[in-house]
Amino acid sequence: PYNSLKKPGQMRAQSYQTVAHGADTIQFFQLRRSVGGCEKFHGAVIAHAGTADTRVFREVTQLGKELEKIGSRVMGSENHAKVGIIFDWENYWALEYTSGPNRDLRYVDQIEQMYNYFYNKNIAVDMIPIDADFSKYDLVAAPVLYMVKDGVAESLEAYVQAGGTLITTYMSGIVGQSDNVHLGGYP
């Protein structure tokens, strides 16, 4: 089922995993279950009955008490990723709405595939914009970086010259910021 509640203890475990990765807050959607629309069967802290006498409400309350006890010890903690994966919205739009060479190529799928590789090896990853400070990372991945805007190739070259490792894949560097093909060779 798509709208099932989390299993007992699952929300707590996921919340602590989030805190362990540097989160300073745990937020819930939705607080109160909707009475209409497509979200009326989504899980929520407060069910349709409107009472605090539910397993979910009790688990959220208990988690709140636990986090209150340890809050000062974990607030502001960080997990410094050594890998950055570039996600660029303009690249997404240009690639998603191009008519070729392959209409089935999906930017987000390629990003997710790259992310999953590192995730499955328990390697922390930051999703970073195209204009990020790459020097913070040992490795920067730019899957299907179809659109290479002015200054990006130079920025990535400088990163590699300084000792960084860049991974890119097919369909990278094909067009500039106006979605026109680079003439005279790709950067």
Name every feature range the model reports, one short phrase each.
Residues 1-187:
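Carbohydrate-binding surfaces of carbohydrate-active enzymes
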